[in-house]
């Protein structure tokens, strides 16, 4: 991202709309489809990690829309609330005795109040709640995409809006399963059986329909977790104090930084945008202050999509867990696709790594063994050996053999001095 922004001058000078469209489309695909992967994760750290990939997609979208300062702005705000969420996930893992599976949690709010409230603030910032830092940066990206007219901008606009719903859904899916609902820790869990879990989802309101992967890496050893009767605990102050400190900018930094970073002179002389790409000019024209933007945000599609994502997550995992079980049953193929990360790992293993191994094997067989060892190394030795055998015939000790060699040498010299000048003319 940083290198792309550093190269924005070349993109502007040469007016590479094709390159910008490519960046816009790649970013929007990343923002949406990495968010889908976050929905099915059960490892608390993986949910936050795929969220990070999705948000990097939003930043890339901003680059494609020539809103470079917005990309940096979202990078900055995202650094605070994502660091908060990662540290909160670590706090939960500590409190759960290194269990990272959100299906084994639930009801942690009363045991870990500081982690609970800071996680809520970080999640609200992530989904773009008005007045929170993520709102100002993410909404600016969405508006910049709406203002651009590059090829692929229609798809990008759809993807970033759909991504708002997806982000809210997986963020609060994790939040509700970890901090609310029935306490599921300190019990024996059988997450390895798909059908057993699908049945359990009908009876247990806290369980998740996606917890049925025999090969899912839950991120913890089978001996980790709370023993029966053991309760979670809040993390020590060396963890909770940074949580509180990170929560403050996660809420406030966007409010105070949007004016200088996007509409002030913060990037003067550093970022130059081609006049034909007017996304930033349109953002500046419609900006009337951070408070006005937050109030206006309550009536925009991103806010209602985020709210819909939160409500949907609450309904599916707190009120009626039969809904996720139904989706798993009827859309098992889709779940398998997401579970296997769109088979990109398999693609990389077969085509990228396999192709590299095939190329390396070919170079080893043809280049190294045949050309280098066979022709140059061993071949040169064989030529010297053959030449030695030929020369050895004339080194017999008989004078007529030496005389014959001298005659051949003289004929060679005469041929050189007589024939070569003819060709030289």
Per-region residue spans from a language model:
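Divalent metal-coordination and catalytic microenvironments
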Residues: 43, 53, 78, 105, ...
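Single conserved hydrophobic/aromatic residue that forms the stacking wall/gate
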Residues: 1-9, 13
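Predominantly late transmembrane helices and immediately cytosolic-facing juxtamembrane segments
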Residues: 82, 86, 157-228, 305-309, ...
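Internal transmembrane alpha-helices of multipass membrane proteins
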Residues: 7, 18-67, 121
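Aromatic-capped, Gly/Pro-kinked transmembrane alpha-helices
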Residues: 233, 237, 248, 259-304, ...
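Interfacial segments of multi-pass membrane proteins
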Residues: 59-63, 139-157
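Interfacial and helix-entry/exit segments of alpha-helical transmembrane bundles
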Residues: 49-54, 59, 96-132, 155-163, ...
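Hydrophobic alpha-helical transmembrane segments of multi-pass membrane proteins
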Residues: 19-29, 76-80, 158-166, 248, ...
